[in-house]
Amino acid sequence: HLSIRRQRQMCIRDRSIMKLSKGWEQAVYVLLMLNLLPEHCVMTSTALSDRLNVSDSYLKKIIKALVKEGLVNSTTGKHGGFSLSKPLNQITFYDIFLAIEGRDTIFASQQLLKPFLGENEGQKAEMCVVSHALNTIQHTLISTLSSITLDEVNQTIVTKYRLNDLNQWVITNSKTL
């Protein structure tokens, strides 16, 4: 296992590699909190945004995207709120990525090889070598995100931290259907 100091160094360094929207991280924690709900209960976006100390209006957009992707159930009405639509072991980081970041390709090529090479050599260019490299990176990223489930993350949290306060907060802020 890596030391905590080494893990922090890697996290700091990793931030410069690729940037996901802040909504992606918020979505992860929303799903982890919804997982703690008692059966037949929901939680409001206001309660979730208060706990995470994030904008309620922005979090509502995040939750709407999670509902659209089929990761969260939405119940309307006086006792309405949100709940998980599937267990954490069936939700991958890639599922969350698709919900929050969209289904577009990660790297959209501008096909600059032909203008880069010039008129004569550019005519010979088939596939842009930069695009090919970025496609390889994209496939690796998708594979990696698809291999990590929220259940794995949740198990690490449960093992490392005492969740008494969080569990009590969930019970206090959940609403029975």
Predicted regions and their residues:
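Beta-hairpin "wing" of winged helix-turn-helix
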Residues: 70-79, 83-85
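Single conserved hydrophobic/aromatic residue that forms the stacking wall/gate
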Residues: 1-14
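Conserved segment of winged-helix/HTH DNA-binding domains
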Residues: 88-114
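Alpha-helical residues within the helix-turn-helix
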Residues: 50, 67-68
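A short alpha-helical element within helix-turn-helix/winged-helix DNA-binding domains
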Residues: 43-53
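Key DNA-contact positions within bacterial/archaeal DNA-binding proteins
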Residues: 57
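C-terminal regulatory/oligomerization modules of transcriptional regulators
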Residues: 109-177
